[in-house]
C-alpha cells in the first residue's frame, strides 16, 4: 500500500513540475495569446492538429466546432487517436460527433482510421494530410540544441498509463541491459525507467536525437524519431 502510494506521489510531483515547465515555455515562446472566449465574433477558427477527435479522455465540444465565435471553422490534420467507430457508438456520441463534423467548413485528417470514421458518419472523402510536426521539421532548432550530457541511453516515449505491461517492461530492460544502456523517459513518468526527465517540447528533440535507440508507441514519438534519424 505504501509503495503504491509513493509511486502515485512521485508521478503527481513529476506532472506538477511538467506543467510548470510547459507553462514557462508557452510564455517564453509567446505561444498562448488571447483566449477565444474573449471574442464575440471571429472571421475563422482553425482547430488541430493531433487527437482533437479522440473520445477516450472525454469529448471536448470546442474541438468539434461547438461554441466557437465563428461561422468558419476548419480542422487541420485532426485525428481520432485510438477511438474507433465502435467506441463512438458505445459512448452514445454518434449524433454529437456527426453534428460537429457536418458543421465544420472544411476538414482534413492525418490518418486512415480518422478518414474512414468520417466517411462512414457523414459520407465525406476527406483529405489525408501531413502532421504539422513533419511539415515544420525543426531543422534550425536541431542545429542549435546542445548535446544531452548523459550516459548512453535508450529513450522510452509513452503516455503515463501505457507501456507498463510486465512483458513489455521486461523486454525493454533486457534489451537495454544487453547493450549497457540506461532507460530514460522524457516527458512522461514511468517508475520502471532509470530516469524520468522533464523537458520543454524543443529540448525533447535533443533527447531523441542523442538516444542510442527509441522505444515508443505514440504517433509523435515516431515522427520525432524520423526527424532526427533515431533508431526505432
Question: Which residues does each predicted region cover?
Answer:
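Aromatic- and Gly/Pro-rich donor/ligand-binding loops
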Residues: 1-99, 145-149
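An anion/phosphate-binding loop that grips the pyrophosphate of nucleotide cofactors and donors
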Residues: 42, 104, 211
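Catalytic donor nucleotide-activated moiety binding site of glycosyltransferases and closely related
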Residues: 75-82, 115-118, 158-201
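A conserved, positively charged/aromatic
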Residues: 98-102, 208
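A short beta-strand/loop micro-motif in the catalytic core of glycosyltransferases
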Residues: 104-111, 215
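Donor nucleotide-activated moiety binding/catalytic core segment of transferases
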Residues: 126-134, 138, 188-223
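Conserved donor-binding/catalytic core segment of Leloir-type glycosyltransferases
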Residues: 147-160
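Structural loop-to-beta junction motif characteristic of Rossmann-like glycosyltransferase folds
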Residues: 229-232
Amino acid at each position: 500500500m505504501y509503495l503504491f502510494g509513493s509511486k502515485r506521489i512521485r508521478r503527481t510531483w513529476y506532472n506538477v513540475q511538467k506543467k510548470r515547465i510547459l507553462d514557462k515555455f508557452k510564455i517564453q515562446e509567446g505561444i498562448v495569446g488571447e483566449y477565444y472566449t474573449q471574442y464575440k465574433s471571429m472571421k475563422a477558427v482553425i482547430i488541430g492538429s493531433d487527437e482533437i477527435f479522440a473520445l477516450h479522455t472525454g469529448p471536448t465540444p470546442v474541438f468539434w466546432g461547438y461554441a466557437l465565435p465563428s461561422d468558419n471553422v476548419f480542422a487541420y490534420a485532426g485525428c481520432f487517436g485510438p477511438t474507433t467507430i465502435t467506441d463512438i457508438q458505445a459512448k452514445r456520441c454518434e449524433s454529437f460527433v456527426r453534428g460537429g463534423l457536418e458543421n465544420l467548413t472544411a476538414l482534413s485528417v492525418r490518418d486512415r482510421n480518422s478518414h474512414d470514421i468520417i466517411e462512414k458518419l457523414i459520407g465525406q472523402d476527406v483529405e489525408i494530410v501531413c502532421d504539422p510536426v513533419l511539415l515544420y521539421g525543426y531543422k534550425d532548432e536541431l542545429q542549435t540544441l546542445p548535446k544531452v550530457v548523459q550516459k548512453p541511453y535508450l529513450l522510452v516515449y509513452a503516455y503515463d498509463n501505457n507501456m507498463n505491461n510486465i512483458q513489455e517492461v521486461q523486454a525493454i530492460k533486457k534489451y537495454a541491459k544487453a547493450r549497457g544502456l540506461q532507460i530514460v523517459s522524457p516527458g512522461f513518468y514511468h517508475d520502471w525507467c532509470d530516469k524520468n526527465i522533464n523537458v520543454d517540447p524543443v529540448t525533447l528533440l535533443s533527447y531523441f536525437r542523442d538516444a542510442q535507440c527509441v522505444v515508443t508507441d505514440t504517433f509523435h514519438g515516431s515522427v520525432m524519431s524520423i526527424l532526427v534519424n533515431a533508431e526505432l
